[in-house]
UniProtKB/Swiss-Prot annotation:
It is found in: Cytoplasm. One of its GO terms (biological process) is heme biosynthetic process. Its main location: cytoplasm. One of its GO terms (cellular component) is cytoplasm. Fe(2+) binds at residues 211, 305. Belongs to the ferrochelatase family. GO terms for molecular function: ferrochelatase activity; metal ion binding. Involved in coproporphyrin-dependent heme b biosynthesis. Catalyzes the insertion of ferrous iron into coproporphyrin III to form Fe-coproporphyrin III. It comes from the Bacteria. This is Coproporphyrin III ferrochelatase. InterPro entries: Ferrochelatase, Ferrochelatase_AS, Ferrochelatase_C, Ferrochelatase_N.
């Protein structure tokens, strides 16, 4: 039996109306949590098919595709994101069980095995009817939220489960303490290493790196009627978190003044404007610095964009510029991060009101339910999506 809370859930665009406030009203019951991620190849034979699936219709040149394939081949064709998600799934379930919450955590991907439609179908056959999804992306934009929601709608339809199950989503957690505090801790630890090596904090640059996206996607990120500036909620959320982190760091290190938000891992049509500056360009123009501290602020785990684009390419750029470089850890399975993500789940299970939800910036806490037009696709137009208010 499908169990509903005080708010009517949106099971697809156009099928139901949710809370006008964007926040779920009242407690909800779920049969499982779904950790929903991007996916990645599990062996050399998977690499090119995976990349072609991911880049289909995006105008990515073949030479770029095969360049990225070589990155995976350095890891024997296995994406590190898979083991990261296996560990994350296990840690989340363990934390839930430790709190007496007997809800299983399932792992599913948008672009590779285990495919979401298969996971939902198998869960349905086990008697599960209500699902709460946790996306492995903290911020708001098409590729990190709306596309997940569209893929849920597509997976439910392909699984033949339309109208039979409920799939809700957790809020974006960019400013939740469980996500932000591990970064602060990691930066503080790395700054100690910088000092131990004899470098001055006043001559250390901190580069907060996140995934670049097309400028138009950035402009459309967030609620349609919000006013976040030229690059939308995506950039505003990142900048707000950066300022919170820096304000904490300068309490003990007031000489920390050189920092900026940078971007990485762009792809797609080379003629399409993407967010800049690229991290490598930013490193090359640093002046008066001895060291650079790289913070992967846009990522929750050590997947390919972190291990290759940062640990390989950006570190090499720093060496070429004569700079000492160090990268902070991603949240991964940090206890604060795991506890924070379970707190998000509890918010929905217990119906925690917005006023009682933690957020470290003035932008949060973010919405449970997306509004019409939120993070719309600038290229392919409207598609049905779960977890949003019907237009």
């Amino acid at each position: 039996m499908i169990r509903r809370s005080a708010v009517s859930r949106v099971v697809a665009e156009g099928s139901a109306i949710a809370s006008d406030s964007g926040f779920a009203l009242g407690a909800s019951q779920y049969d499982a949590v779904v950790l929903l991620s991007f996916g990645g190849p599990e062996g050399p034979e998977d690499v090119v098919p995976f990349l072609k699936k991911v880049t289909s219709g995006r105008g990515v040149p073949d030479e770029r595709l095969y360049e990225v394939a070589e990155h995976y081949n350095h890891f024997s064709g296995i994406s590190p994101i898979n083991d990261c998600n296996r560990r994350l799934r296990g840690a989340l379930e363990k934390e839930l069980f430790s709190r007496g919450i007997r809800i299983p955590v399932l792992w599913a991907n948008r672009n590779w095995q285990p495919q979401l439609e298969e996971v939902l179908r198998e869960a349905y056959d086990r008697g599960f009817r209500a699902f709460l999804t946790l996306f492995t992306s903290a911020y708001s934009c098409y590729s990190s939220c709306r596309q997940y929601r569209e893929d849920i709608a597509h997976a439910v339809e392909r699984a033949g489960l339309s109208g039979r199950i409920i799939v809700d989503k957790l809020r974006q957690f960019f400013d939740h303490p469980g996500f932000v505090l591990p970064f602060i801790e990691g930066i503080q630890d790395c700054l100690e290493q910088v000092k131990e090596r004899g470098f001055k904090v006043s001559r250390t640059a901190i580069l907060f790196s996140t995934h670049s996206i097309p400028e138009l996607d950035a402009a459309f990120s967030g609620p349609e009627d919000a006013h976040f500036g030229k690059y939308g909620a995506y950039v505003s959320q990142h900048k707000a978190v950066v300022e919170v982190i820096m304000s904490r760091l300068r309490v003990t290190d007031p000489d920390l003044q050189n920092y900026q938000l940078v971007y990485q891992s762009r792809s797609g049509d080379p003629s399409t404007p993407w967010l800049e500056p690229d991290i490598n360009d930013a490193i090359r123009v640093l002046r008066g610095c001895e060291a650079v501290l790289i913070v992967p602020l846009g990522f929750i785990s050590d997947h390919m964009e972190v291990l290759w684009d940062l640990d390989n390419e950006s570190m090499q750029t720093a060496r070429e510029c004569g700079l000492f470089a160090i990268r902070t850890p991603t949240p991964g399975t940090h206890p604060l991060y795991i506890s924070g993500m379970v707190d998000l789940i509890v918010e929905r299970l217990e119906g925690v009101p917005r006023s009682a939800r933690p957020a470290m910036t003035d932008l949060g806490p973010w919405f449970d339910v997306c509004q019409p037009g939120c993070c719309k696709n600038s290229r392919s137009g409207f598609k049905p999506a779960y977890g949003g208010v019907a237009p």
